[in-house]
Amino acid sequence: MDVLVVGIGVIGSYLAHAACDAGNAVTVVARGRWGDTIRDRGLVIHHHVQHKTTIDHPYVVDGIPQGERFDVAFSVMRQDQQIAALDQLEGIDADLLVLVGNNLRAQELADRLRSHGHARRVLFGFQSTAGIRKADHVECVRWGATGLDVAPLHGEPTASDKNLLARVFTGGYRPNWTHDFEDWLLYHAAAVLPMCFVSYLCGCDLRAASHELLRQMVAAQGEGYALLARLGHPVAPEGNEGLLDGGLKTRMWLAVVWIVARTKIGTLCVDDHCRHAPDEMRDLEVGFERIRGLAPDFPMPAWDALLARMGNWNEVCRRWGT
């Protein structure tokens, strides 16, 4: 299968590795020194939890191909980058386009693709990996082979969608099919943003967070979940019902959060991303505020307190922006 991956950061790099590992002909879009590094040395990934290093040799281009034929194309970028690259994304000749990553402007993006006459299928997805891109390799944190949570923004995937991605990913990495991916993206934002507030509050070092601060973070996540439920969004992914309602699952989640915050996993999964992507986190929070505007009287005291303690987004971006 001919596969295109646009955006070779941590997430895009592992997705490209999974596609290469399954025997596909993979083309990646990587510019500048990073593109040169992949051409010269290969796509080198150190898998932190698995204690192994992989090297793949995808074909590297420095711009989104226009008119070249692919079976599947993955765009793995921030929501603002996806929108800025809309004209180039629309020009990709592929049976299926999958937009991967945090995105609270997904409906806008889908509408604009449709208005631009994009006739092929568009799915949205998220890959639960984290880490940091170094000068010559990627440090990747993942559990097991992981996979790609994926679905249309609204509705169910088609049989042809499932068959196509099943042919792309034939190893341990698999598509985790769901439905109505807008719900998935909203609940993910509700979980991630309080982690970001605490990370920035602690100087992008979760190890400095007190147990009480972590409790407040989990309470804020619960408020975000409750808001979305109030607005009629079913909990996503399925199985997370009751995770943040204050019961046994919540206490177990708090224990997991405490372990993550005290180890390198927290550094790679949360702190490094916050340190290198403050603009993305700001945009995600702005998007969630728009959702809050649909229920302006819904109380979120823990959320608001953490956001206030974190400080002004302009100051955060000025401190951590590159």
Predicted regions and their residues:
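NAD(P)+-binding Rossmann beta1-loop-alpha1 motif at the extreme N-terminus of oxidoreductases
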Residues: M1-H51
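Rossmann-like NAD(P)(H) cofactor-binding subdomain of soluble oxidoreductases
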Residues: T53-E139
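Hydrophobic anchor at the start of a short beta-strand
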Residues: V3, A25-V26, L97, V122, ...
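Active-site-proximal catalytic alpha-helix in oxidoreductases
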Residues: E182-Y225
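N-terminal glycine-rich dinucleotide-binding loop that anchors FAD/FMN and/or NAD(P) in oxidoreductases
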Residues: L43-V61, V192
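NAD(P)-dependent Rossmann-like dehydrogenase/reductase catalytic/cofactor-binding core
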Residues: G222, A229-T322
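Helix-loop-beta segment of a Rossmann-like dinucleotide-binding subdomain
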Residues: E139-D149, Y200-A209, K264-R275
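Rossmann-fold dinucleotide-binding core
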Residues: R105, L109-H188
